[in-house]
């Protein structure tokens, strides 16, 4: 995949700084990953797929003033969304020190003033309402709904990055949409869809 070409074909406008930020992010990720094993993705093509996967939702997400990403890991999707949405305050929650340090380093190196890195488990954070809550964590949708309770209200949207099993995980009482792209299923939950 040619990442830049694929991103330019998206039905959205990315900030002028986006491609420079992505390039620097990738350079740092490859260096850090050799020492700290931040992600299982080791080659450029896989990283490019992860980046595309992370930024794709800006084609359908509403504009928002703040976003919480639960379990950001090496930056997917929260950090990538922050680069694509510079007007949105993005809080990245990552309990592992090595990953949180990497996120903090990227924030400082790229001057991402819209990013806040929190090195905690989301369960240990004080409640605060966010307009959008995201997660690419490999846990059940019901668990994500439980973890996000103190961070959303009736107007908030939840965006969970899921695979094929999403259909087995969704409660029919939820108001949701599933946006499918290749093997990815973006589960968008909210009262006002």
UniProtKB/Swiss-Prot annotation:
Q: Which catalytic reaction applies to this protein?
A: guanosine(527) in 16S rRNA + S-adenosyl-L-methionine = N(7)-methylguanosine(527) in 16S rRNA + S-adenosyl-L-homocysteine
| Principal localisation | cytoplasm
Gene Ontology CC:
cytosol
Signal peptide range = none
- Annotated residues for binding of S-adenosyl-L-methionine: 71, 76, 122-123, 136
Quick check: keyword Repeat in the entry? no
- Which Gene3D superfamilies does the entry link to? Vaccinia Virus protein VP39
State the compartments where it is located.
Cytoplasm
Q: What is its EC number?
A: 2.1.1.170
Top-level taxonomic group: Bacteria
Q: Which UniProt keywords apply?
A: Cytoplasm, Methyltransferase, rRNA processing, S-adenosyl-L-methionine, Transferase
Name the Pfam families for this protein.
Answer: GidB
> Which residues lie in coiled coils?
none
InterPro entries from the UniProt entry:
rRNA_ssu_MeTfrase_G, SAM-dependent_MTases_sf
Annotated GO molecular function terms are: rRNA (guanine-N7-)-methyltransferase activity
Q: Does the keyword Signal apply?
A: no
> What does this gene product do?
Specifically methylates the N7 position of guanine in position 527 of 16S rRNA.
* NCBIfam families per UniProt: rsmG_gidB
Tell me its family. Belongs to the methyltransferase superfamily. RNA methyltransferase RsmG family.
What name does the UniProt record give this protein? Ribosomal RNA small subunit methyltransferase G
Species of origin: Sulfurimonas denitrificans (strain ATCC 33889 / DSM 1251)
């Amino acid at each position: 995949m040619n990442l830049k070409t694929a991103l330019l074909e998206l039905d959205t406008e990315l900030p002028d700084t986006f491609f420079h930020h992505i390039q620097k992010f990738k350079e740092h990720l490859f260096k850090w990953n050799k020492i700290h094993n931040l992600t299982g993705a080791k080659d450029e093509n896989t990283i490019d797929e992860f980046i595309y996967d992370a930024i794709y939702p800006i084609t359908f997400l509403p504009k928002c003033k703040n976003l919480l990403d639960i379990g950001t890991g090496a930056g997917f999707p929260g950090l990538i969304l922050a680069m694509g949405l510079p007007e949105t305050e993005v809080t990245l929650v990552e309990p592992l020190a090595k990953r949180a340090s990497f996120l903090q380093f990227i924030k400082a190196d790229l001057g991402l003033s819209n990013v806040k890195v929190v090195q905690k488990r989301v369960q240990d954070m004080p409640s605060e309402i966010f307009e959008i809550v995201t997660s690419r964590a490999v846990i059940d949708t019901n668990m994500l709904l439980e973890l996000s309770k103190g961070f959303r209200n009736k107007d908030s949207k939840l965006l969970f990055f899921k695979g094929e099993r999403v259909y087995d995980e969704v409660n029919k009482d939820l108001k949701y949409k599933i946006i499918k792209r290749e093997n990815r299923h973006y589960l968008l939950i909210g009262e006002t869809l």
